């Protein structure tokens, strides 16, 4: 699928692996793609910034969400450095990222586009019904439909 990515979309995917590693994740997930998109000069990144989601804020929101999820299942994370708990040299692609990229491919095909661009990736992430990205957006008060309309 990566052969269908445009240049900027490839950069987003590559940067997402760095974001995942920087957050101590053993896998690249949809939320890491979202952070990477927010850091681009592409209109998809601008849409995220206009919605109030800058890359650092997203990283912080991911960390808070992770801690909330652990707390819900009874794991106390106070005093634990979670950023280094799951390090690998290179994170593998996780299910939510793969699903988001599959939806991005469907978006590109549905629009008759030959290549997958950043806008397709963002649309693919916004189409998720469950998972970290919808939780993050809801927690930050972001209307997914409104954000989708900006693309």
Model-derived regions: residue spans:
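Histone-fold recognition with a strong bias for associated Lys/Arg-rich disordered tails
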Residues: 1-151
């Amino acid at each position: 699928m990566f052969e269908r990515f445009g240049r900027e979309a490839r950069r987003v995917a590559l940067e997402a692996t760095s974001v995942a590693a920087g957050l101590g994740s053993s896998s690249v997930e949809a939320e890491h793609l979202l952070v990477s998109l927010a850091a681009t000069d592409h209109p998809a990144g601008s849409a995220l910034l206009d919605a109030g989601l800058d890359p650092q804020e997203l990283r912080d929101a991911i960390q808070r969400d992770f801690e909330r999820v652990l707390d819900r299942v009874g794991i106390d994370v106070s005093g634990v450095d979670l950023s280094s708990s799951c390090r690998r040299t290179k994170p593998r692609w996780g299910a939510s990222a793969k699903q988001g990229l599959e939806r991005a491919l469907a978006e590109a095909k549905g629009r008759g586009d030959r290549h997958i661009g950043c806008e397709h990736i963002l649309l693919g992430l916004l189409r998720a019904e469950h998972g970290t990205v919808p939780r993050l957006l809801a927690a930050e008060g972001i209307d997914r439909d409104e954000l989708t309309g900006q693309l």
